[in-house]
């Protein structure tokens, strides 16, 4: 069975309850299914807390974090360090053999600078599946942070949804974007079960999908197109439904190419 990438987002990394639910679901799933799993994570909340503590400004442009040269080291420490090792610690606590990686390990995802105006923000493209496939074949759970590196050795902060998409393309994997919201909501706050590109454009034009959710929806649409298969946006809050989700049952919004 092709691998499944679970991209973690939102306040999940900041919530012990959420992490407990997620890792319990992962244990249950791994006990009953052979499907290889990969976790990709960002950690915006971890970065925001650190920046606040250091009295550094947080700037965003079109939903993407602006990353000046003097901040990339701090952001790398937060994402590839604190956030990544927090997840490895939870995996250890639940007796899951895991390995912490960043996008540059084994050239798994190739990264170039997205836009000079954004600073050290990277564009992710598919890379080599060798390292991660080797880990999966040996029963490890790869936990991959959304920090990448360019050919000339510049560290880059990559939008985690886009990083997960590039890695899914690399591995031929299915993709779930797991966050705080149970999916995409319509104007009345009701979950939308399925979403096409035209429906997404309509909701963006109407101002119903805004800010970070635009980035998330576009990343999911890009992923669905790139992978040639649906991508799920769902919430970690319904832990009892997660094993079904990991097995292909939609519980949030299914994004169609």
UniProtKB/Swiss-Prot annotation:
Q: What is its main location?
A: cytoplasm
Question: What EC number(s) would the UniProt record show?
Answer: 2.7.2.8
Pinpoint the site Transition state stabilizer: 7, 216
Per its UniProt record, what CDD domains does this chain match?
Answer: AAK_NAGK-NC
Q: Please tell me where substrate binds in this chain.
A: 43-44, 65, 157
Top-tier EC class: transferase
Localization in the cell: Cytoplasm
Sites binding ATP sit at 180-185, 208-210
Family membership noted in the UniProt record: Belongs to the acetylglutamate kinase family. ArgB subfamily.
Q: What is this protein called?
A: Acetylglutamate kinase
**Native organism:** Salmonella agona (strain SL483)
